[in-house]
Regions:
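Active-site His/Glu-centered metal-binding helix of metallohydrolases
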Residues: 120
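Vicinal oxygen chelate
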Residues: 1-10, 17-117, 126-128
Length: 128
């Protein structure tokens, strides 16, 4: 089974480039919206493997709700990146204009990891 994350964000063209920088990915498939200003669907890959699909959100969402509500469940995108340098690059890129929930730290199950909500409202956990 192949599984990867789909995110719907405002400014999908910019977001896709941010995620390419963060994860060393490239856009390998893209369908633009009707006026060619955003992605209807784009696929990002690393070494030929799809890791993320990005599409334009149909309208702006109140990302601030994430900070105002107490959630009983949590969902986020988990990426094991394989090296401390890759984690640092992803963390630095994703935290630009975002909110750091957990800075890079050590856990019993991962020696170098962090959690951040990026400027598009997507929550990421990155680790080695």
């Amino acid at each position: 089974m192949k599984c990867y994350t789909q995110v719907y964000v405002m400014n999908s063209l910019e977001a896709a480039q941010t995620y390419c920088r963060a994860f060393g990915a490239e856009v390998t498939f893209a369908i633009m919206n009707g006026d060619e200003t955003a992605y209807a669907h784009a696929e990002l890959s690393v070494n030929g493997e799809g890791i993320l699909a990005v599409a334009e959100a149909p309208e702006a969402y109140d990302v601030g709700a994430i900070h105002r509500m107490k959630w009983q469940t949590m969902t986020f995108n988990a990426f094991e990146l394989g090296s401390r340098d890759a984690v640092r690059r992803a963390f630095d890129t994703l935290s630009e204009g975002g909110v750091v929930l957990e800075p890079i730290h050590e856990l019993p199950w991962n020696p170098y990891c962090a959690t951040v909500i990026d400027r598009y409202g997507v929550c990421w956990w990155v680790g080695v």
